[in-house]
Curated annotation (Swiss-Prot):
PROSITE patterns: LCN_CSAB (PS51863)
Protein name: Beta-mammal toxin Css4
Tissue localization of expression: Expressed by the venom gland.
Effect of residue 47 to R: 962-fold decrease in binding affinity to rat sodium channels
Protein family per UniProt: Belongs to the long (4 C-C) scorpion toxin superfamily. Sodium channel inhibitor family. Beta subfamily.
Length: 87
């Protein structure tokens, strides 16, 4: 019974730690990474994993790379005090 409670608690903790999602952002310009092939996209998957680690995923959503399974402190679009090339 104690083992079952520990397993349940661990699964709940993992779900909260890896819950963040968001657009991949260029930290210098404040712009989202653009993509044109909507849905599963090798470019977005590769860029998300490069920036956030192997555990993350990525696909093209609304012409921007959307990253999934991020850690809570991951930086995603929009950046505070930074607009995309003044737009």
């Amino acid at each position: 019974m104690n083992s079952l409670l520990m397993i349940t608690a661990c699964l709940a903790l993992v779900g909260t730690v890896w819950a963040k999602e968001g657009y991949l952002v260029n930290s210098y310009t404040g712009c989202k990474f653009e993509c044109f092939k909507l849905g599963d996209n090798d470019y977005c998957l590769r860029e998300c994993r490069q920036q956030y680690g192997k555990g993350s995923g990525g696909y093209c959503y609304a012409f921007g790379c959307w990253c999934t399974h991020l850690y809570e402190q991951a930086v995603v679009w929009p950046l505070p005090n930074k607009t995309c090339n003044g737009k």
